[in-house]
Amino acid sequence: MTKKLPVEKKLSRKPISRACEFCHLKHLQCDTGRPCQNCVKRNIGKGCKDKERKTKKRQLKNNTSNSDLENIPKQVKTDIIPGPIRMTPTTAIYQQNNDFSIKKIHSLTTILNSTNSFLGTDFVNTGNIDDPKNEINNPPSTLSISTNGSNPDSTFDSIWAGDEYKKLNDIIGLGRASGLSLSHPNTETEKGIVHVNSISKINSRPFISLSIDSTGGSIDEYNLRYSIPSDSTKFKQLKIDTNESFLSPYMFRKAIKTPKEFHEKRSTILPHNYRIGYRYLLKTLHNMFINETTLDAETLSIRKQQVSYIVKSILVKYTENFISISSNMVEEDLLLQELTLQRTLLEFESMSRLVPATPIAIWRRTGEICYISSEFTSLTGFTKKEVLNKRSYIFEYMDHESVIHYFETIYNKLSFNISSNAAKFSSSNNFLFTKCNLLLNNGSFLKCVCCWTVTRDTLKIPVLFTGHFMPIFDVQ
């Protein structure tokens, strides 16, 4: 055991930079002499030498990097060959993109302002609405946008700019507008002209988009093709494709009635094609407001303005929030959303059957009715098979003023809780109270007070809307 040293001796000792091997091993206080006093006392003075230290890795790296830096200028000097500087194709493209790419990228706001003409009066001037079956039968094509340039293979340098065109393509559905040209001021005098070919296919996100069209033609052809007939043109009957693979809610409920059957047959459930739903939405609006031969010129003009206002409320105010939330969704997310919807719908139906309630109707965010209660059928006179055995929309059972009010509240306020100073009803995050005129089986309308509730998924996307209707009877 090592003898304890007095305090005076401990204070007089001074540490040294390097100990001998013996003192280092035994953790003893060594001195600067060689041999040290500890080794002399133990008669091992012949082997007393400094402890060799390992080279630090940090020092080794610094020495290596310094030596490399010293050698670099020499190598550069020997490798440089005097002569003219030649730019590689990669360098030229890089410099060209740096000079002109920022100037040529159009923002989403600019594109919407330049392509929203079909939302105004052009949407309701001449032509006819096509059958939604073209959404399925016509193969998709790419969107080609050019500005009178020469290189068709170059694309946007910014992935965000390309994504803006992709989202815009999904919104307005210009699937085959290969002749579309988005010009920019003084584009002929600028050298860095940007071309976009095959930015996005119309079916890039077919189950998410709010697309209206997938047919060809330019913007003008699009306006003519999807506009409402003028006074001089004859109204044509709009046919519905009976061969479309659409499973009505009535038939779906016959196949799956309980939660157990739902889990057994969940592999057969497919994502709902909301794109076709929005196509039929516009078709239904056209039939309700315009497709009447008894309308005079003044009434027809007012109806056209009303339809244009409704379409704007969907595309301008609703899609901005919807696309920002659902831009990263894939088809698997839509499948999960559909499974959640159907399972939630089973719970709602079970609750309405067990508990006596007010007349209830449940519909998707497109307005497609999924369920009506027995009280609703008793109130309106329509049977469940009449309503649920086809693609029915909730606004089909309202008058024109209620339809306009419906789109103002559902698409502009309730879906994403957008504030509105003009709203004359109390509301919260998930429900609101309002009034509407409900269509009865005999063709008349019944004034009702309504409570509309929204059910959202985990991404805060509206999935189901529930409407409670309480009739208001005038007391004389």
From Swiss-Prot:
Location in the cell: Nucleus
Listed name of the protein: Glucose starvation modulator protein 1
Entry keyword Transcription regulation: yes
Span of the signal peptide: none
Region (Disordered): 48-73
GO BP terms, alphabetized: cellular response to starvation
PANTHER family: GLUCOSE STARVATION MODULATOR PROTEIN 1, ZN(II)2CYS6 TRANSCRIPTION FACTOR (EUROFUNG)-RELATED
Keyword Signal in record: no
Pfam families tied to this protein: PAS_13 (PF24990), Zn_clus (PF00172)
Any one Gene Ontology cellular component term annotated for this protein: nucleus
DNA-binding region, residue range(s): 20-48
Origin species: Vanderwaltozyma polyspora (strain ATCC 22028 / DSM 70294 / BCRC 21397 / CBS 2163 / NBRC 10782 / NRRL Y-8283 / UCD 57-17) (Kluyveromyces polysporus)
One annotated GO molecular function: DNA-binding transcription factor activity, RNA polymerase II-specific
Role summary: Transcription factor which regulates nonfermentable carbon utilization.
UniProt record similarity statement: Belongs to the ERT1/acuK family.
Main localization of the protein described in the UniProt heading: nucleus
Sequence ranges assigned to domain PAS in this UniProt record: 347-417
